[in-house]
């Protein structure tokens, strides 16, 4: 599973589970799992709401990381294969 591959990548930072990168990683895993669930169960509105909440949390964390350290942000975006944030 994708989760195991990313966690093995993050094992060197195992003591730092509160870091922004680890939180974004765990949110991304939850998002991918919920997305595959919603492909099968289209009318599961509670899961859709949970997905939107997790997407918002991840978006806020990525915005914080892009402001604080742009290099770490770019590396994380490339590792997780997600798009960059839209800037206003």
From Swiss-Prot:
**Where is this protein chiefly located?**
plastid
Whether Ribonucleoprotein counts among this entry's keywords is yes
Q: Where in the cell does this protein reside?
A: Plastid, Chloroplast
Keywords from UniProt, A to Z, are: Chloroplast, Plastid, Ribonucleoprotein, Ribosomal protein
Please give the biological process terms from Gene Ontology that the record holds.
Answer: translation
UniProt GO molecular function? structural constituent of ribosome
- Which Pfam family would be a valid example here? Ribosomal_S15
- Gene3D superfamilies reported in the protein's UniProt record: S15/NS1, RNA-binding (1.10.287.10)
Superkingdom classification of source: Eukaryota
| Coiled-coil intervals, chain numbering | none
A GO cellular component annotated for this chain's UniProt record is:
ribonucleoprotein complex
Task: List where the protein spans the membrane.
Answer: none
What InterPro entries does this protein map onto? Ribosomal_uS15, Ribosomal_uS15_bac-type, uS15_NS1_RNA-bd_sf
Q: How does it assemble?
A: Part of the 30S ribosomal subunit.
Q: Which family does it belong to?
A: Belongs to the universal ribosomal protein uS15 family.
Protein name as catalogued = Small ribosomal subunit protein uS15c
Q: Which organism is it from?
A: Arabis hirsuta
Q: Source taxonomy lineage?
A: Eukaryota, Viridiplantae, Streptophyta, Embryophyta, Tracheophyta
């Amino acid at each position: 599973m994708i989760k195991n591959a990313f966690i093995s990548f993050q094992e060197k930072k195992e003591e730092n589970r509160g870091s922004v990168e680890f939180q974004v990683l765990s949110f991304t895993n939850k998002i991918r799992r919920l997305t595959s669930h919603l492909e099968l169960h289209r009318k599961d509105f509670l899961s859709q709401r949970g997905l939107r909440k997790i997407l918002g949390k991840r978006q806020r964390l990525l915005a914080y990381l892009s402001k604080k350290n742009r290099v770490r942000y770019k590396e994380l975006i490339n590792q997780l294969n997600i798009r960059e944030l839209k800037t206003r």
